[in-house]
């Protein structure tokens, strides 16, 4: 029977069958060897690419810094027409409170900006609805009719609740008594 060599583990398996290879490939040592192999291959590939770039002149020979084009030396220009993007961080927004431009540093330190006054007369505050005399009489008529229906409903639900309680209570006692006797 032919034997099988695992390239990652450098181990000869007892015989070349699908079940033996499957069991070996599921093993912890084999999985670790496969991971080590591919990380080593990736590191070698990255080192090779760095050496190719260095030899092609992408890196400067003198100090080893990147030779980038001059376009990256300055920040990009702000596009005024593109209003969907937020402004760059170095632009101060218009609603920031600052000292007036004519003040010197000493006066600017003592300058405390005042918050704008808010006019509350146009705003409507939440208030409870006001009732009138006619609506008061309607409310009293409704309130007089409500307790009668509520009492009937309350008595009916109370009796139903008592019936339910007594049924379940007796059933529970019976089942408990059966359990104790048995």
Curated annotation (Swiss-Prot):
This is U1 small nuclear ribonucleoprotein C. One of its GO terms (biological process) is mRNA 5'-splice site recognition. Residues 129-182 are annotated as: Disordered. Residues 166-182 have a biased composition (Basic residues). It comes from Schizosaccharomyces pombe (strain 972 / ATCC 24843) (Fission yeast). One of its GO terms (molecular function) is pre-mRNA 5'-splice site binding. One of its GO terms (cellular component) is U2-type prespliceosome. Component of the spliceosomal U1 snRNP, which is essential for recognition of the pre-mRNA 5' splice-site and the subsequent assembly of the spliceosome. usp103/U1-C is directly involved in initial 5' splice-site recognition for both constitutive and regulated alternative splicing. The interaction with the 5' splice-site seems to precede base-pairing between the pre-mRNA and the U1 snRNA. Stimulates commitment or early (E) complex formation by stabilizing the base pairing of the 5' end of the U1 snRNA and the 5' splice-site region. InterPro entries: Matrin/U1-C_Znf_C2H2, Matrin/U1-like-C_Znf_C2H2, U1-CZ_Znf_C2H2, U1_snRNP-C, Znf_C2H2_sf. U1 snRNP is composed of the 7 core Sm proteins smb1, smd1, smd2, smd3, sme1, smf1 and smg1 (Sm proteins B, D1, D2, D3, E, F and G, respectively) that assemble in a heptameric protein ring on the Sm site of the small nuclear RNA to form the core snRNP, and at least 9 U1 snRNP-specific proteins usp101/U1-70K, usp102/U1-A, usp103/U1-C, usp106/LUC7, usp105/PRP39, usp104/PRP40, usp107/U1-H, usp108/U1-J and usp109/U1-L. usp103/U1-C interacts with U1 snRNA and the 5' splice-site region of the pre-mRNA. Residues 130-150 have a biased composition (Low complexity). Keywords: Metal-binding, Nucleus, Ribonucleoprotein, RNA-binding, Zinc, Zinc-finger. Belongs to the U1 small nuclear ribonucleoprotein C family. A zinc finger (Matrin-type) spans 4-36.
């Amino acid at each position: 029977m032919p034997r099988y060599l695992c390239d990652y583990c450098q181990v000869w398996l007892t015989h070349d069958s699908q079940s033996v290879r499957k069991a070996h490939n599921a093993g912890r040592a084999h999985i670790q060897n496969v991971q080590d192999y591919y990380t080593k291959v990736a590191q070698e590939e990255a080192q090779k690419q760095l050496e190719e770039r260095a030899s092609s002149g992408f890196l400067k020979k003198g100090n080893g810094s990147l030779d980038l084009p001059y376009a990256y030396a300055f920040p990009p220009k702000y596009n005024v027409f593109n209003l969907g993007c937020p402004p760059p961080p170095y632009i101060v927004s218009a609603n920031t409170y600052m000292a007036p431009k004519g003040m010197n540093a000493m006066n600017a330190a003592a300058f405390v900006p005042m918050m704008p006054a808010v006019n509350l007369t146009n705003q409507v505050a939440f208030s409870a609805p006001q009732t009138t005399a006619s609506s008061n009489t309607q409310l009293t008529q409704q309130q007089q009719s409500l307790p009668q229906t509520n009492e009937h409903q309350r008595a009916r639900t109370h009796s139903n609740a008592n019936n339910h309680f007594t049924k379940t209570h007796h059933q529970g006692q019976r089942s408990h008594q059966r359990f104790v006797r048995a």
